[in-house]
Amino acid sequence: MAESTFGRQAVNDGKLCARLRNGKDVTLDTAERIRSFIRSNQVQSSLAASPTELGEAATKGTTTMSGKTSKAKKTTSRKPAKEAASSAGDRPFRFYDNRQKYLAFVNTTNEKRKVAERAAKELMLLKPTPPALRLFDAGMGDGTVLTHLMRAMHRRFPIMPFFIVGKEISLEDVRLSLEKLPDRFMEHPASVIVITNLYYAEAPWLRPASVKSAAALNWREVALEGDSAYEYGEQLAALDPFLVDGWQVKSSEKTGNPMYVRPSVLVIYRKDHSFLLDSVIPKPGQVGGGYDLAIASQPWRARMSAEFKVGKVLAPIVRALGAAGRLLAVQSCGQDPAQELVNKVWPDEEPFKVNRHELIKVLRAELGRDARNFNFVTGSDSKAIFRYEMHTLPSEVQQSIGTSTLFAAWNASIYVNQIEDERLESVLSSNEYLQHTAQVLKKHKGLWFNDESFVVSRKQ
């Protein structure tokens, strides 16, 4: 036995320190056992230590540990199925937990493409600096917006390295996103793409806020081999066991929002470009933000307060912008046929009470004196508001409208207006809601929606 990082009689802790630092093969259970051991030894040592010694230890931030250690059994962070099921049953239901509604909405409307087109307009205003153009996607979803934007980025910056961070809590959406990436690595090989389940206040820096979560950080690097999109796709598909373990979620008892069980970071790049990307590939604890562009498309519930949206989402992302960096935020704003349909069923429904002007006002207050370092552009309605539509044929909305079209229009309307399932039970007992849907479709010759956008940019 020798003196080591954890004190005398600590066994094999050199390897453990490396694992903690790299976020590799350290479960939450292991991290908690270490913390418990430290706490118990702190209590024991404080009984024998003098006030002077305690003061010095607190000042230096050191801890002395002693005692025998035993071999640790391999543990896993996975929760029993019964426990997960019980917690899921007790939590509040959230409208965007329903995968069926989400996928139906995504595949029957062109919102994703419209958001990507709006984001692409920001590219001409960027002023990236070496070693890479840095992009943060605050809510990657199924990767549709990101991959559309990457095509536009390649067109404008064909040889510039890309560093892209996508924040996504949903395992299903991460899988869908990975399916879209092989072609992106073929077209733009100088890309480093990072996917994480960290919170908005943590994701830009790829660093958990709490010590406990940081100790259990699940960091995985994947260097893709080969020279074809097929080979890259096969290697990304093989990551599924890692995703299943790293993207487990639990529900907040207060809000019902999903929270990660274990913080995870997945770093992907092409092995044959690792030399070129050496200064771009992130290392644990060494990511400093500095993003050239950040996209926040529909990252919150419409009914949440402006203070919540700013404090939990907007302010952390704005602070992560680099010099001349830009944040594009997009949210639904209503005043469209979809809201008209919802108001036919629920006349007093007002889901979009917080507009872009209110968000900017609260954001200025949240930033305080730092607000003078940013430009806030809400724009006029003609520039800030853009429209997207549900896919329909002209013949489908002229005379007799098919049932599938009615259901698709109804689903898209209640999804955008964020109507919870429990409120739908009484409405779905009759066909009156389908009659209202048909009336709105015929009146407007289709179904369309309004989104509004605003930009916050850091001054140079």
Label the predicted regions.
Residues 86-130:
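Class I SAM-dependent methyltransferase Rossmann-like catalytic core
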